[in-house]
Amino acid sequence: MGNVVQERQGALAQGEVLPRPAASQSEGFKQGRSVLNSLVSGAFAGAVAKTAVAPLDRTKIIFQVSSNRFSAKEAYRLIYRTYLKDGFFSLWRGNSATMVRVIPYAAIQFCAHEQYKGILGKYYGFQGKALPPVPRLLAGSLAGTTAAIITYPLDMVRARMAVTPKEMYSNIMDVFVRISREEGLKTLYRGFTPTILGVVPYAGLSFFTYETLKKTHAEKTGRAHPFPYERLVFGACAGLIGQSASYPLDVVRRRMQTAGVTGHTYSTVLGTMREIVAEEGIVRGLYKGLSMNWVKGPIAVGISFMTFDLTQILLRKFQLL
C-alpha cells in the first residue's frame, strides 16, 4: 500500500497527469452530449421555422423599412407582384442569409437557455425542477441576449438582402465586403441597441410563456410531455406575446439597419422613433406590419419550440439504443 502511494506521489512530482475518476469522466461526457444535443436541436428548429415563414418575413421587412402604408391587401399584392416578376423562389430571397444567421442564433439561444436554466436552478435551489417565474423570465432574456450579441452582423446582412434588388448584392460575402468598405465596419452593428432592448422582453416572455404553459399543462393533466400539437399551440402563444411586446423596437432596428440603402440617416434609437412617429404616426409607423407578425410570428415560434423539443427527445432516444 505504501509503495502505491509513493509511486503516485512520484508521478505527480514529475508532472504526470493522473487519469480522472470514471464517474467524473462520465459526468463530463453527459454534459458535453447535452450541450451538443441542444445546439443541434436548436439549429434544426430555427432552420425549419424560418424557412416556413420566409416569404411573410421578407414582406414584413419591406414594409417596415418603407413609409408605404401597410395592409393585408397591400402585402398580398407585394407577394403576388414579386412572384410574377421574379418567380416563386424569389419569395425566399435572402433566406440563405437568414439561414446563415438563424442556424447559429437558434442553436446558441436554445443551448444557452438550457444552460441558464441549470445555473439559475442551482442558484435558487430548483435544480432539476421547473424554475419560479422570475428566474424563468431571466433565463429566456439572457439566452436571447447571448445569441443576439454573437450573431448580430448576420442579421444586418439578412435585412440588407431582403430589401435590395438581387442585382445589388451577389451573395452574403458581397454584402459583408461592400458594407465594410463603403460604410465602415461599425455599420454591421447599426441598430444593435434597439435589437438588445427588443430581445430582452421578446426572448424573456417567449421562453417564460412556453415554459409556464408546459408546467401548467403537466400539473393539470399529469402528463410530463405534451403532444406535438400542444407544443405547437404553446409556442404560438409564446410568439404572439413576445413579439407584440417588442415589435416597435423591431421596426426601429430594421430602419437603422437599412438606412444605407433607403436614403435615410437614422442614427439613434430615440431619433429614429421620433422620425417614424412624426412622418407616419405611432400605430401606422411603429406598429406597421404587426398584423402580419401576428400570423407569421406565432407560426414560426410555435414550429421552433415544437421542433426543438421533439428533436431533443429523438436524439436522447437514439443515444439510449
UniProtKB/Swiss-Prot annotation:
Q: Catalysed reaction(s)?
A: ADP(out) + CoA(in) = ADP(in) + CoA(out); 3'-dephospho-CoA(in) + ADP(out) = 3'-dephospho-CoA(out) + ADP(in); adenosine 3',5'-bisphosphate(in) + ADP(out) = adenosine 3',5'-bisphosphate(out) + ADP(in); AMP(in) + ADP(out) = AMP(out) + ADP(in)
Q: Which Pfam families does this one have?
A: Mito_carr
The yes or no answer to whether the keyword Transmembrane is present is yes
Magnesium as a keyword of this entry, yes or no, is no
Topology relative to the membrane: Multi-pass membrane protein
Kindly state which keywords UniProt assigns to this record, in alphabetical order.
Answer: Membrane, Mitochondrion, Mitochondrion inner membrane, Repeat, Transmembrane, Transmembrane helix, Transport
Which InterPro entries does the UniProt entry name for this protein? GDC-like (IPR002167), Mit_carrier (IPR002067), Mitochondrial_sb/sol_carrier (IPR018108), Mt_carrier_dom_sf (IPR023395)
Can you say where in the cell this protein is located?
Mitochondrion inner membrane
Tell me, in a sentence or two, what this protein's role is: Mitochondrial carrier mediating the transport of coenzyme A (CoA) in mitochondria in exchange for intramitochondrial (deoxy)adenine nucleotides and adenosine 3',5'-diphosphate.
Q: What is this protein called?
A: Mitochondrial coenzyme A transporter SLC25A42
Query: From which source organism is this entry?
Result: Danio rerio
